[in-house]
């Protein structure tokens, strides 16, 4: 049987907290805060059996409730201990709950900054510019790109910063619920995305992404892009999309090297094929997964296809390429 070129694990929205089960912000979904660590442990055990070579954690590793209980560090220690059992590099994407718990400077100096865990083929990054985005080649002919979806945001930037001011302007231009900007400005449609718990990508980050993909085009690489926020309207609920998702899609559609864009944030998950042929995958969230189920995946990269084996709520998926 053919061996894959590279194998890696995928998981999203663990949102662990040592508290009783509860509900989401809109009180429409059940959340299993304490049990999420058990599901993470099960995922790690399976990845060990499958001998994955790295794991990509798509953001929201602990829940914002921890900050209010002064338990952020303790909760992070709990989930990191589970991930340490993988014995492989874990690449962390940052979501809104990372910023509920920690400031950007704190995150950059924490274990959730995985930019240096890129093996022998270290690529470029924007860490020095205070943007948590980096890329590397996990195996010949493949490239991973991790994006900072809260580069533009009011929760991911210090209040005195220019980016916070710019982000506030964007948000309040579209959302007039000034008493609670986590409430969407409309009840249906793409404008729902302009909420405080979302964010976007700066022009600098988009230019960097374009340059990375241009080089991958020339090298004939297959590129997998990871972000907490999804960018395709057909792969997620509109309320979960990045503010400037169209700008990201414009960049992606101009490069033949893009294989797929993998995100979290929408706990229901989603899948679609873009007009360019790129796949958009939104992984189901652990936090809203009942204790008797699972929500993670193992992805196998071959020379001609990517096979994603889902567990529990995550469905299998195969992407073929030539």
Swiss-Prot record:
Which cofactor is essential here?
Mg(2+)
Which family, according to UniProt? Answer: Belongs to the ADPRibase-Mn family.
Name the residues that span the membrane: none
Superkingdom, natural source = Eukaryota
Identify the Pfam families for this entry.
Answer: Metallophos
**Keyword Transmembrane listed:** no
Q: Give me the gene this protein comes from.
A: adprm
Q: Does the keyword Transmembrane apply?
A: no
Subunit-structure text: Monomer.
Which amino acids does the record list as binding Zn(2+) 1? 13, 15, 60, 267
Its protein name is Manganese-dependent ADP-ribose/CDP-alcohol diphosphatase
Where do the annotations place Zn(2+) 2 binding?
A: 60, 96, 228, 265
PANTHER family attached to this UniProt entry: MANGANESE-DEPENDENT ADP-RIBOSE_CDP-ALCOHOL DIPHOSPHATASE, PTHR16509
Query: What is the reaction catalyzed?
Result: CDP-choline + H2O = phosphocholine + CMP + 2 H(+); ADP-D-ribose + H2O = D-ribose 5-phosphate + AMP + 2 H(+); CDP-glycerol + H2O = sn-glycerol 3-phosphate + CMP + 2 H(+)
Q: Which keywords does the record carry? A: Hydrolase, Metal-binding, Zinc
Write down the EC number. Answer: 3.6.1.13, 3.6.1.16, 3.6.1.53
* Protein function: Hydrolyzes ADP-ribose, IDP-ribose, CDP-glycerol, CDP-choline and CDP-ethanolamine, but not other non-reducing ADP-sugars or CDP-glucose.
Q: Name one GO molecular function term.
A: ADP-ribose diphosphatase activity
